[in-house]
């Protein structure tokens, strides 16, 4: 069984993200003492030569998950270029026996400068030779997991600003190879895993089609005129000057006459607005115990003078009706028929005969 792998031309977005991820990975953790600046990746190219893969084992093969063990061999033309700052003096290790400046001057503790000097350095890595056993797990939900079972780095070519100084060149070669081995062990698998998760997340967003909302639109509320009950007018007036429809102030006396007549009847003020027997189904009955305010449409320059009524039963008609019609909703803009508002109150107290009073107090005793 054989497979053909295509090594594509990677996009600019891939290179930009890979450069940012590599910069973060190279600056993570403890760097060598001679490197005093941050490491910035300046160039990255994956090359045109693909790696070689030999299938050793297929452990899981399905539409959602794949797991396999491969022998990975790479000897391509990929390269990586980065820059940083190094300390020119001392460029030495912790031990005097393995110092990079081995000679009589360093053995006596003599240095080339009296104070440390930071020098910019540019490094290019190329001619990678890798060989390893790779465990590859591909999941459509969790991404790609890549693990090297052994050290993959065989050799790498390090070119730097200090290639003319052989001692520094050998020191950089050893340090960079050590950092690359650590990167292949820990950093590269995490970078590939994050790249695969971002790719899967982008692919899932493209497949999701937004569905329109099925909730019905709420009907708009009718506008409330602001001039019906002015908020700045808080003076309460007796009901003797309140009309349920727009009328001239001269009509107040006729309304008061109706109030006085209705207060003496047995039905109370039930038929004040509309005669008995003609109430429609939409008529409303309000029970309230306070006073109301006059709408702005009934206000005039000179407020009318309240007219006091006297009833034989001791009922204060004006005060009692003022307690009946509290609430702005009595004549609010939402009242469907303001002229058909029915009012109910208790009839005036009438003295009852002694016979009726005695009949109500009659007690029955069972022997």
Swiss-Prot record:
Keywords: Lipid transport, Lipid-binding, Membrane, Mitochondrion, Mitochondrion outer membrane, Transmembrane, Transmembrane beta strand, Transport. It is a multi-pass membrane protein. This is Mitochondrial distribution and morphology protein 34. PANTHER family: MITOCHONDRIAL DISTRIBUTION AND MORPHOLOGY PROTEIN 34. It comes from Malassezia globosa (strain ATCC MYA-4612 / CBS 7966). It is found in: Mitochondrion outer membrane. Residues 267-311, 347-367 are annotated as: Disordered. The keyword Membrane applies. Residues 1-197 form the SMP-LTD domain. HAMAP family: Mdm34. The keyword Membrane applies.
């Amino acid at each position: 069984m054989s497979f053909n792998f295509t090594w594509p031309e990677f996009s600019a977005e891939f290179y930009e993200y890979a450069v940012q991820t590599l910069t973060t990975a190279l600056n993570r953790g403890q760097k060598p003492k001679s490197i005093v600046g941050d490491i910035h990746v300046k160039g990255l190219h994956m090359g045109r030569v693909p790696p070689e893969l030999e299938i050793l084992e297929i452990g899981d093969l399905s539409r959602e998950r794949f797991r396999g063990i491969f022998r990975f061999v790479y000897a391509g033309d990929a390269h990586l270029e980065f820059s940083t700052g190094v300390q020119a003096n001392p460029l030495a290790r912790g031990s005097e026996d393995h110092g990079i400046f081995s000679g009589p001057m360093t053995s006596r503790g003599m240095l080339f400068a009296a104070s440390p000097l930071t020098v910019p350095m540019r490094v290019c890595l190329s001619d990678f030779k890798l060989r390893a056993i790779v465990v590859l797990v591909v999941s459509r939900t969790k991404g790609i997991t890549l693990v090297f079972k052994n050290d993959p780095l065989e050799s790498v070519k390090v070119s730097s600003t200090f290639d003319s100084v052989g001692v520094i060149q050998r020191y950089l070669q050893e340090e960079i190879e050590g950092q690359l081995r650590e990167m292949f062990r820990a950093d590269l698998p995490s970078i590939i895993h994050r790249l695969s998760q971002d790719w899967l997340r982008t692919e899932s967003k493209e497949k999701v089609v937004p569905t329109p909302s099925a909730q019905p639109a709420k009907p708009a509320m009718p506008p409330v005129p602001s001039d019906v009950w002015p908020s700045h007018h808080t003076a309460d007036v007796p009901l003797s000057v309140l009309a349920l429809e727009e009328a001239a102030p001269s009509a107040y006396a006729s309304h008061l006459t109706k109030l006085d007549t209705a207060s003496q009847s047995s039905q109370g003020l039930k038929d004040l607005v509309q005669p008995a027997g003609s109430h429609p189904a939409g008529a409303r009955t309000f029970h309230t115990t306070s006073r109301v305010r006059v709408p702005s449409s009934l206000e005039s320059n000179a407020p009318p003078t309240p007219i006091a009524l006297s009833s034989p039963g001791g009922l204060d008609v004006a005060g009692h009706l003022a307690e009946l019609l509290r609430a702005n909703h009595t004549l609010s803009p939402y009242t469907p028929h303001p002229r058909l508002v029915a009012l109910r109150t208790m009839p005036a107290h009438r003295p009852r005969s002694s016979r009726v009073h005695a009949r109500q107090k009659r007690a029955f005793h069972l022997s």
